[in-house]
């Protein structure tokens, strides 16, 4: 074979390996030609997909301990980047012994924070991936944790390999309530796909609401390809505040096609028989316990009365 044909054959083979190899990027996105309706594999044919609509008939109260956010008050350096699909924050592994983690709250393992990213919509009526009674928030933040002792590849093959905390973002005009500023102040540097910037002295508690006691829990999946069903989801009941201007800055980020990325959320997926657990706050728990106590007294009274009549 002539040398130039041999080189050409090798180049073709290399292109096949790169385009079809594991973990390759097949150009998925959120536009009409590459959006969620076109995602293949697990995204199309598996039964425990995310996100979901959290509706009262599908929710059960759960007597779970509170979830602990370890090292979330420690500070460190993170890298913010515009991936062309989302605003991404990583670098937590370099924090070493200060790396944020979660445990408790019904989780059977401890999980280390690997990254967080955001989803948003083109207006305030859409944007969050999860919904509450079919109603959406304008944005949602996902804190992705990997089970301690596992690599990311190993975690993706386990039904509880990842623990993702979902935080709703609610619009507010109160500057005191807004903790999103350390990130939003850097969005001007991240306008184009591929842009990166460092953020020093960052505390992960900046992206948590004040109350983390109440949450919803269910088994689900990644909300992006390959949609692996490896996620224990914790969706916090209390949202975090974000301003109209900050939402505007998110919607100005450009995707890989160099156009404004005004939406990057996956549509709601069917529950397919799954149940959602709700871990209430202190106030809610007191009301529930009071209700249980009253019910217990009534049942006991009826039992005694029945015994007397026999």
UniProtKB/Swiss-Prot annotation:
Asked whether the keyword RNA-binding is assigned, the reply is no
Q: What family does this chain come from, according to its entry?
A: Belongs to the alpha-carbonic anhydrase family.
Q: Which residues form the Alpha-carbonic anhydrase domain?
A: 26-280
Identification of the protein by name: Putative carbonic anhydrase 5
Which annotated residues bind Zn(2+)? 117, 119, 142
List the CDD domains.
alpha_CA
According to its UniProt record, where is this protein mainly located? Answer: secreted
